[in-house]
């Protein structure tokens, strides 16, 4: 096949594509805008949060803040510069502990969302910071108390034939 016939074949293919209205390639920025218009119900919804600071609430009630570096189809997450925080809003206190790089299994994620880094510290300015160990012990006591209350409630409801599904790992 000669060079001229190859050029003609290529021109014919280009003309056919234009006639069939093949979409032109879009830039990465346009793709982000296009994808942001859709609500995903899968882990694909997380893609726009990569390399951004996020908040993650775990099933055991822990709250983690960090930069999302990667994730997989099971919503397993890798956070960098991760910080765990415990809030006691009634007493207007909080505690935090650096966790570094943190891997989270997707089955433990209750909720996640992006953090506005410009406003992140505003609520903390009005709160008193306490030692993390003290806060963790207080949280453990509160969780144990809640577990006993929920177990009692479950037994009471079971006597009336109502199933009450509460697990110790569901402290959120």
Curated annotation (Swiss-Prot):
One GO cellular component term: ribonucleoprotein complex
Bias (Basic and acidic residues): 1-17
Record localization: Nucleus; Cytoplasm; Cytoplasm, P-body
Phenotypic consequence of gene deletion: Increases the level of stress-responsive gene mRNA during osmotic stress.
Outcome of substituting residue 105 to A: Slightly reduces affinity for poly-U RNA ends
GO biological process, any: deadenylation-dependent decapping of nuclear-transcribed mRNA
A Pfam family hit: LSM
The keyword Ribonucleoprotein is assigned to this record: yes
An annotated Gene Ontology molecular function: mRNA binding
Sm domain boundaries: 41-118
InterPro entries, A to Z: Lsm1, LSM_dom_sf, PTHR15588, Sm, Sm_dom_euk/arc
Keyword entries, A-Z: Cytoplasm, mRNA processing, Nucleus, Ribonucleoprotein, RNA-binding
Residue numbers spanned by region Disordered: 1-22
Assembly with partners or alone: Component of the heptameric LSM1-LSM7 complex that forms a seven-membered ring structure with a donut shape. The LSm subunits are arranged in the order LSM1, LSM2, LSM3, LSM6, LSM5, LSM7 and LSM4. Except for LSM1, where a C-terminal helix crosses the ring structure to form additional interactions with LSM3 and LSM6, each subunit interacts only with its two neighboring subunits. The LSM1-LSM7 complex interacts with PAT1; within the complex PAT1 has direct interactions with LSM2 and LSM3. The LSM1-LSM7 complex interacts with XRN1.
Function, as annotated: Component of the cytoplasmic LSM1-LSM7 complex which is involved in mRNA degradation by activating the decapping step. Together with PAT1, the LSM1-LSM7 complex binds to osmotic stress-activated mRNAs to attenuate the osmotic stress response, probably by limiting ribosome access to the mRNA and consequently translation.
Family: Belongs to the snRNP Sm proteins family.
Additional comment: Present with 3490 molecules/cell in log phase SD medium.
The name this protein goes by in its record: LSM1-LSM7 complex subunit LSM1
Gene: LSM1
């Amino acid at each position: 096949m000669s060079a001229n016939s190859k050029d003609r074949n290529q021109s014919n293919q280009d003309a056919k594509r234009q006639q069939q209205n093949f979409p032109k390639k879009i830039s990465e920025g346009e793709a982000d805008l296009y994808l942001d218009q859709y609500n995903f119900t899968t882990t694909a919804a997380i893609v726009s949060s990569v390399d951004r600071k996020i908040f993650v609430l775990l099933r055991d009630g822990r709250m983690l803040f960090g930069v999302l570096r990667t994730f997989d189809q099971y919503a397993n997450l890798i956070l960098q510069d991760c910080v765990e925080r415990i809030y006691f809003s009634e007493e207007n206190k909080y505690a935090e502990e650096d966790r570094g790089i943190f891997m989270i299994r997707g089955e433990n994620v209750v909720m996640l969302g992006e953090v506005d880094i410009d406003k992140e510290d505003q609520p903390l300015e009005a709160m008193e910071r306490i030692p993390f160990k003290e806060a963790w012990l207080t949280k453990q006591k509160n969780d144990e108390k809640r577990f006993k209350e929920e177990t009692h409630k479950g037994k009471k409801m079971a006597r009336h034939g109502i199933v009450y599904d509460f697990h110790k790992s569901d402290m959120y």
